[in-house]
Amino acid sequence: VIDRIARSFIEPFSVGELANYSSSAIRRYPAGTQAKDLADAAIHEMVVRLGDPYATFDERRMRRKGKRISGIGIEATILDGRLKVIAPLEGSPAQKSGVEPGDIIVEIDREKIYGLTLKEAMDRIHGPIGTEVLLRIQRKGARKLGLPVPRARFRVREVRHAMFGDIAYIRVAFFGPDTEKLLRKALGAIKKEMGGAKPSGYIIDIRNNPGGLVGQAILLADAFLEQGMIVATTGRHAKGSRRYDAYRGDFVNGSPILILQNEASASAAEILAAALKDNRRATIMGTRSYGKGIVQTRFPFGAQGQIKFTTHKFMTAAGIQIHEVGVLPDIVVNGDPRPTYGAAATSIDRCPTAGKARDRMLGCAILFVNKGRSIDSFLQALPKLN
């Protein structure tokens, strides 16, 4: 385990450092402690000492038996010792109960969780199906609030589509194992609904998409590119780096694409957005994305369990590292009408509504496509605020 971490972790750690951490953890236990418990303590100490908010140690024999265990459907990280929600998964108990991107979970079942690792915090959230977990949440600009959230099995609908006139809308909520296959199915359905005609444009909505399988994001980017670099992953050593290029051809034959993103679009979602933006294949509308541009790898080691830690960073086709930077939109649509990030900008209050949810961001996206995808024409067409 020590050797694996020393060789693969994204930041340099010596074998000696890790061995010292391991030894100090073992010395805290009394004589006669079982070897397996000492091994768990040593591994846990090393993982914590990495300072990697995404690092976890999963002890296989600690997995609960006899009960069906479930979570609530959130992607989260540890930030300054606090559990921060990247985004609730679409259709999850967390989303239905009112958990929002950016929420800070400060208590779980009335117990403070400051300083816990990501795994320790998530283990407290998980529990038997049919039970409830009480979250105390700090939300920006609001008082702390308590949210009871049921633990339940749920299924994320990875891809769905709709038509707004001759504009095709594709929602990608998460990158699961079938996302690319579901995209191809959606494109086929759109073609059938259009009677073989070509849509005037495609809107790909990755708002509140916390990521998922990187390989699926690469496949989706490849589906809209004729050629060009999609993403590169860089490890600590040159031999761990890899470049991914488009090769399958553009499934929509050059039709215009607009991507909707927000501050909860993360990881794999950012790979898709950056690849299409940097290859000048899509216009990005919304806000700066989350900025999770790192890859975690799982390393199983027999009956003891598995560890997961950061091994690579993403590099976009433009040579930018996404991590802690995010993908910048071409058109900023938020609550502030002042231009930011060097991009065109408008207040979301100026956007028309669209769909049953009266979605203003989507309304702006439809308007942009209808105005010939010209930023100037789009901004001129927006109604002025009183």
Features from the language model and the residues they span:
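Amphipathic alpha-helical segments that form the core helices of the histone-fold
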Residues: 19-34, 43-47
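PDZ-domain C-terminal substructure recognizer with occasional recognition of PDZ-binding tails
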Residues: 49, 53, 81, 106, ...
